[in-house]
Amino acid sequence: MTKKQKKMLYRILIAAALFLAAKFVPLPPLLSTLLYFIAYFTVGYDILHKAWKGICNRRVFDENFLMAVATVGAIALAVYEKSGDYAEAVAVMLFYQIGELFQSCAVGKSRRSITALMDIRPDYANIERDGKLEQVDPDEVEVGTVITVQPGEKIPIDGEIVEGTSALNTAALTGESLPRDVTPGDEVISGCINMTGVLKVRTTKAFGESTVSKILELMENSSSHKSRSENFISRFARVYTPAVCYGALALAVLPPLFNLISGAPTVWGVWVYRALTFLVISCPCALVISIPLSFFAGLGGASREGILIKGSNYLETLSKTKTVVFDKTGTLTQGVFEVTGVHHSPMEERKLLAYAALAECASSHPISKSLQKACGGKLDRSRVMDIEERSGRGVVATVDGHSVAAGNSRLMEELGISWQECRSVGTIVHMAVDGAYAGHIVISDVVKPDAREAIAALRRAGVRKTVMLTGDMQKVAAKVAEELGVDDFRAELLPADKVSEVERLLGEKGSGECLAFVGDGINDAPVLSRADIGIAMGAMGSDAAIEAADVVLMDDDPMKIAKGIRISRKCLRIVYENIVFALGIKALCLVLGALGLANMWAAIFADVGVMVLAVLNAIRALRTSKN
């Protein structure tokens, strides 16, 4: 508990003790009255002060005003009727403050889930000067500076490891508890915790442009993006509170005046009591507090899973998603090409791969890198000479004194070499050695292990249509779509074509339904912004993704798309439950109070009891299922 919460708890305990003594201990009337008043001012002085400030600032109608008028009115009525029973007035204020403390603790709990993410902000960076480590502000570190990260410290700035090996805890960013091993040459991002070894990192970004700064900015701005439900409750409260105040005034004045005109007893005390009861019941705290808290808890629960949602309006949109469109590369597939087969080769596979890797060693193309990776170990580039790159076809080189050609079918035809068709799906690299066909190598983008299950999980989450967009060949796209079980796909698309496809799908969706686009955030900014909701996957370290998307998944796990949708739907379900429950109970109690069938104790339940139950329901949004 915070100091403020502890202070409130002590005030409540003191007031409760005085209240119980005055209520149940046989005491002289004067002493009993004194205890009631001490208890009332102990627990309620801040409410009275806020109500007075509101009146002075001409912002009269709020929950503080309602509580002040109701309790002061109840005390005045007890004085007027000389009953000496101030218990109800004190009880209203006491239980109201108990409810306020409870909701403060609930907000604190959900805020801590966001604060845990905020703890990724580093306090300092270590720079070595004159053989000693000096702590400096991360903002002062220039790009290209080598910083030292000790075990247990946060990596303060994005960079590349130049020395040391370690394991990194990325849980605060990704929600993934399994440490990630890093070695020299690996890129690291700010916000991760170094667990084992000392690392020296060369910074590649300024602190303000680093991942941790972008994420913190995103989370700090999330509260400004309010949902329709929150905006509705804000507008509702602005109209509702003055309306019930005037309603209570009418209830206190009009029936006695009518009785006076008709010659019946005025019974002012009865109607004033009913009006005060009406005021207590009408307090909109349950709605005003629990609705924003539900969204806040939903955002907090999602962030603990490595799903960053930029505001409650996006959470609300995500809950209505019925169509999910994927960009294939980097979302459903690894985005990393791998050798998946060597066919019809008269020579040893390893030797053919070595020839291909050496011939392609001067190229930075992903296919060349996949050949070098499949070959294993470091390549001896002295073995290759006379490299001739033939644009759009392949490469010809001399390896170990042999003429080696590696490329597509057009290169083979150009060299007059007969080649064999491959039925495998992927990029085919045909090989020729000394003018003779030596077989072909199949290179494919590998499908993520849980991509198929992610599509199935989306269906279970209520998504009706999944579509895959890709720039790959029709044959490759068809195989991936069939393997994953997506409903539809479009192949051989340029970036502009993807925008057109999303616009077409937006025109086909039903009323009240939303379309989500999932991309890796690197080349997808136009499509991410065009969809109802843009989801960037694997965005750790990607500024473009964090800027362009509405929802940011901090790792490459496609299962988190369905999890994010489930979290959003649970949150919205809780919001609607609270709205219906709070309005239903209050409407019933308001009618009973106006008819004189509900006393002040029923009013306390209708106010504080409903608020506590609504807040308890709201913090359920923090809990996320692990499956």
Could you tell me what each predicted segment is?
Residues 1-14, 240:
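N-terminal membrane topogenic signal
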Residues 16, 232-262, 277-295, 576-605:
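Bilayer-spanning, highly hydrophobic alpha-helical transmembrane segments
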Residues 36-124, 128, 140-142, 146-147, ...:
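Actuator/coupling domain of P-type ATPases
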Residues 52-62, 105-116, 293-312, 621-627:
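Juxtamembrane helix-loop transition segments at the membrane interface in multi-pass membrane proteins
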Residues 63-71, 173, 273, 283-359, ...:
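Conserved catalytic phosphorylation-site environment of P-type ATPases
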Residues 247, 509-512, 549, 554-627:
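Membrane-embedded transport module
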Residues 339-465, 474, 483-502:
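P-type ATPase nucleotide-binding
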Residues 399-401, 427, 433-577:
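Conserved ATP-binding TGD loop and adjacent catalytic N/P-domain core of P-type ATPases
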